[in-house]
């Protein structure tokens, strides 16, 4: 394949070309203290254990959350999409809030397919904006909402309703009044310019709408009743009065404000969501939007009685769940990622085999390749998707397709056709999400068996392996209090954790083809997933592009 000078990689001064390299991503496999809720620790995982305990210079931990994967803060859990973006791209691209800021500042948000879709309701129907009213910057930001309202009004929105959720968690309790007053002033200005703009409903973030991890669907239902049905136990003529009054209720604060609706002079709710309306959820952080998005988007829904399910045009600020593709429409697209490691390696003649089962196949191909479909060079690449089990929860068959993935990888390695064999083994994440601890232990054991199968093949061809993960999950299956102890609910029951975690993930290198003297560097302050691409390029015998995050390895004579 002809290589233009722009794509040509320099030869590594110390590491040879020509070694078969297996790149293994264990999905949802973080590192945490060993206890009964650490399914990785409790599973028989001899292959992974041998890496951790066998060679301290070739096993280490890297970050897979927060700023290391382009998310705004260290409170942001990683996920499979941003994780594979970072693994494949070798650089950190803005995700989440940063991406929204850029799209709003440039105006690109108003040119995208998502905004065009919701704007089709502007002429005859209402635009509803739902989210956390705060400048905390963790889930949402007031200035982004203000720009969204302004831009929508300038582009034809004639009737706007805002459904606010007060914060008091990421900002000071009591600050809600000021945020409501600021928003109300903006809406007054719009009304003076002929746009019918009002706050329509509200409530506290921990009590209305913003539940997460399917902890309490009643929270979502309270929001649904206020926003869609126009029903709530408290009715007010304006939102400032509502927040000030409800804060005086016993036990109430910004986080736990009871739901309210704004009504007109006749006592009728001013802004229930009805057929033909457009709805935008303006939080950029995903975790507290997914449940509400399901209620808005899924026709087949059984978590609570919605009473009615309006036919709306719904878009999220972002897509909140890449695996569920939820919501299916969104205002801000994923980052534009160029010059990925996969594209560089193909331009330099490296042949690649990539494989996973359906639930993570897109991650080891599309997301790895910078949100790009298809092959860079079909003569040098082969992607294989193994169909995932369907119609059952993953804890029913926790082994999933791990062994089939291992077999495909083994066969690809032994075929001698590929320089790189890349897989994602989904078990730890997909079974971890079910909250079934026993099944997740089985899942981790199956993943380790697949790893062993790949290691054995690498041994036969005298190749190299790189094993890492995209984020944590299976290593901690219980919610914890501030002291780190398992948290209990009001009835004294253990609170199971079904989400990703903030834990670091392991990375290990090895195999008979690994040159003598290769070890992980100790001088990198906070290495993360984005450092993996340069590392893999080095092991293929190349120096990574100068703007890539630095390699994790060094060669000691």
Swiss-Prot record:
<feature type="binding site">
    <location>
        <position position="470"/>
    </location>
    <ligand>
        <name>Mn(2+) 2</name>
    </ligand>
</feature>
<dbReference type="InterPro" id="IPR017850">
    <property type="entry name" value="Alkaline_phosphatase_core_sf"/>
</dbReference>
<comment type="pathway">
    <text>Carbohydrate degradation; glycolysis; pyruvate from D-glyceraldehyde 3-phosphate: step 3/5.</text>
</comment>
<dbReference type="GO" id="GO:0009409">
    <property type="term" value="P:response to cold"/>
</dbReference>
<dbReference type="GO" id="GO:0009637">
    <property type="term" value="P:response to blue light"/>
</dbReference>
<dbReference type="InterPro" id="IPR006124">
    <property type="entry name" value="Metalloenzyme"/>
</dbReference>
<comment type="subunit">
    <text>Monomer.</text>
</comment>
<keyword id="KW-0479">Metal-binding</keyword>
<dbReference type="GO" id="GO:0005829">
    <property type="term" value="C:cytosol"/>
</dbReference>
<feature type="binding site">
    <location>
        <position position="360"/>
    </location>
    <ligand>
        <name>substrate</name>
    </ligand>
</feature>
<feature type="binding site">
    <location>
        <position position="27"/>
    </location>
    <ligand>
        <name>Mn(2+) 2</name>
    </ligand>
</feature>
<feature type="active site" description="Phosphoserine intermediate">
    <location>
        <position position="80"/>
    </location>
</feature>
<feature type="binding site">
    <location>
        <position position="212"/>
    </location>
    <ligand>
        <name>substrate</name>
    </ligand>
</feature>
<keyword id="KW-0464">Manganese</keyword>
<dbReference type="InterPro" id="IPR036646">
    <property type="entry name" value="PGAM_B_sf"/>
</dbReference>
<dbReference type="GO" id="GO:0010118">
    <property type="term" value="P:stomatal movement"/>
</dbReference>
<keyword id="KW-0963">Cytoplasm</keyword>
<feature type="binding site">
    <location>
        <position position="500"/>
    </location>
    <ligand>
        <name>Mn(2+) 1</name>
    </ligand>
</feature>
<keyword id="KW-0324">Glycolysis</keyword>
<comment type="function">
    <text>Catalyzes the interconversion of 2-phosphoglycerate (2-PGA) and 3-phosphoglycerate (3-PGA). Required for guard cell function (e.g. blue light-, abscisic acid- (ABA), and low CO(2)-regulated stomatal movements) and fertility (e.g. pollen grains production).</text>
</comment>
<feature type="binding site">
    <location>
        <position position="80"/>
    </location>
    <ligand>
        <name>Mn(2+) 2</name>
    </ligand>
</feature>
<dbReference type="Pfam" id="PF06415">
    <property type="entry name" value="iPGM_N"/>
</dbReference>
<feature type="binding site">
    <location>
        <position position="471"/>
    </location>
    <ligand>
        <name>Mn(2+) 2</name>
    </ligand>
</feature>
<dbReference type="GO" id="GO:0004619">
    <property type="term" value="F:phosphoglycerate mutase activity"/>
</dbReference>
<dbReference type="GO" id="GO:0009506">
    <property type="term" value="C:plasmodesma"/>
</dbReference>
<feature type="binding site">
    <location>
        <begin position="285"/>
        <end position="288"/>
    </location>
    <ligand>
        <name>substrate</name>
    </ligand>
</feature>
<comment type="similarity">
    <text>Belongs to the BPG-independent phosphoglycerate mutase family.</text>
</comment>
<dbReference type="GO" id="GO:0005740">
    <property type="term" value="C:mitochondrial envelope"/>
</dbReference>
<dbReference type="Pfam" id="PF01676">
    <property type="entry name" value="Metalloenzyme"/>
</dbReference>
<dbReference type="InterPro" id="IPR011258">
    <property type="entry name" value="BPG-indep_PGM_N"/>
</dbReference>
<dbReference type="GO" id="GO:0010037">
    <property type="term" value="P:response to carbon dioxide"/>
</dbReference>
<dbReference type="GO" id="GO:0006007">
    <property type="term" value="P:glucose catabolic process"/>
</dbReference>
<protein>
    <recommendedName>
        <fullName>2,3-bisphosphoglycerate-independent phosphoglycerate mutase 1</fullName>
        <ecNumber>5.4.2.12</ecNumber>
    </recommendedName>
</protein>
<feature type="binding site">
    <location>
        <position position="429"/>
    </location>
    <ligand>
        <name>Mn(2+) 1</name>
    </ligand>
</feature>
<dbReference type="GO" id="GO:0009507">
    <property type="term" value="C:chloroplast"/>
</dbReference>
<dbReference type="GO" id="GO:0030145">
    <property type="term" value="F:manganese ion binding"/>
</dbReference>
<dbReference type="GO" id="GO:0005886">
    <property type="term" value="C:plasma membrane"/>
</dbReference>
<keyword id="KW-0413">Isomerase</keyword>
<dbReference type="GO" id="GO:0009737">
    <property type="term" value="P:response to abscisic acid"/>
</dbReference>
<dbReference type="GO" id="GO:0006096">
    <property type="term" value="P:glycolytic process"/>
</dbReference>
<dbReference type="GO" id="GO:0005576">
    <property type="term" value="C:extracellular region"/>
</dbReference>
<feature type="binding site">
    <location>
        <begin position="169"/>
        <end position="170"/>
    </location>
    <ligand>
        <name>substrate</name>
    </ligand>
</feature>
